[in-house]
């Protein structure tokens, strides 16, 4: 079986990039929400219902995307920590066996 080598620092960097994407989506979501609220008083009838429904679906979809990205960030950060811990434990075990 091939050896798997993982750079914990790269996992952390990737987590930061996903976190930036989630943050950007949150800002865009807030921007769209504010536009929708500003027009809300001028919409009437079916147009208002359709627009509010569309904005609601958009908001739900954006929130789901943000949650998914936050989950990826959490998993990448935990994975990086786990790999570092495993490497440290392996180094300590090797050092103790070889009397370093």
Swiss-Prot record:
A single cellular component GO annotation: extracellular region
Residue stretches spanning the membrane: none
Keyword Zinc-finger tagged: no
Keywords: Chaperone, Secreted, Virulence
Classification via Pfam families: WXG100 (PF06013)
Keyword field contains Chaperone: yes
InterPro entries for the chain: ESAT-6-like_sf, T7SS_ESAT-6-like
Localization in the cell: Secreted
Function: A secreted protein that might play a role in virulence. Might serve as a chaperone to prevent uncontrolled membrane lysis by its partner EsxA.
Similarity comment text for this entry: Belongs to the WXG100 family. CFP-10 subfamily.
Oligomeric and partner information: Forms a tight 1:1 complex with EsxA.
Annotated protein name in UniProt: ESAT-6-like protein EsxB
Native source species: Mycobacterium leprae (strain TN)
Gene: esxB
């Amino acid at each position: 079986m091939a050896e798997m080598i993982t750079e914990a620092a790269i996992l952390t960097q990737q987590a930061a990039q996903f976190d930036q994407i989630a943050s950007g989506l949150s800002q865009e979501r807030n921007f769209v929400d504010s536009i929708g609220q500003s027009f809300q008083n001028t919409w009437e009838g079916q147009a208002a219902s359709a627009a509010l429904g569309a904005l609601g679906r958009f908001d739900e979809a954006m929130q789901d995307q943000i949650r998914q990205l936050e989950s990826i960030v959490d998993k990448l950060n935990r994975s990086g920590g786990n790999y570092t811990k495993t490497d440290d434990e392996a180094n300590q075990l090797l050092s103790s066996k070889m009397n370093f």
